[in-house]
Amino acid sequence: MMRSLALVLAACGSVIAAAPASADWRSQYRELGFGVIPVETQTQAMASFEAFIPYASQKLGVPVRLFTASDFIGVNNALIAKQIHFAWSSSSAMAGSWLECRCVEPIVAALDKDGNLGYNAVLIVRADSPFQTVDDLKGKIVARTEPNSQSGFLVPTIEFAKMGKPVDRFFNSPVSGGHTQSVLGVLNGTYDAAFTWTTRGDGYGQIRTMIDKGMLRRDQIRVIWESDLVPAPPVIVHRDMPADLKETLIEFFVNLHRDRPDLARAVAHGETQGFVRVDLTKYESTIESRRMLRDARRRGG
């Protein structure tokens, strides 16, 4: 009888051991959609990820499709609707989506070239402009990007209010629609200044991307205000994503810099020491800032 019981248990063990293979996420997902916003144009975004997409498809074992939208909320909405499966987002957009649906979460983010997990919002002016300080810009045209941008909207809105210089009152502050538009607007004189993002030494971020694309020379602009370090833009997924798929994506990104540093650089938009695992706790301050901004708007403040 003991021998029969052992055989039964062995058979059950075989079934259990085989279960993960039969339940592998690839049996549910014939392809994966990866969402990004174009730093330049949609055509250039496709070119920037030309090598990443086939590499990701090979490593993940299913075709990966690139999805682009004009802003972060478009990318996040596609993720929430499960039209795509993972996305490069802004911390602020992720926090805003989380407050609305509690259905998205960050899985990895890129370190900068010095190993910092974050970046700085900056206020830039033309190098040949007369503006030297924030106070010099009172009443001037100072662009923010769009409401779901961490560095281009949320951080300056919150931080300048704390300084007693609310952006909407201290400046004339139009919304440019994106970081590229903001920087180009400063260069061509449309804006006196604009908020954007970078890391120490411009290792990655908007300034580095535009320098690498030949759209900007570093000596054309000056930074006259810089925020404290804010959480790095995360790669996000839907919270009900199967755990094995989530772990596969995390492993893929964590190993990307080791295996293909050129592709890690493309995803991070500049120099990086690689991607590391993150979770919602890393973004608690951003979520709280979005909550404060949302509540102030509801009060009409």
Identify the role of each PLM range.
Residues 6-17:
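Bacterial N-terminal signal peptides
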Residues 17-23:
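Boundary at the C-terminal end of the N-terminal hydrophobic targeting segment
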Residues 77-136, 157:
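Acidic, polar ligand-binding/catalytic clefts
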Residues 73-87, 100-101, 119, 135, ...:
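Short helices/loops that flank or line small-molecule/ion binding pockets
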Residues 129, 141-244:
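Pocket-lining segment of extracytoplasmic ligand-binding domains
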Residues 23-95:
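Extracytoplasmic small-molecule ligand-binding "clamshell" domains
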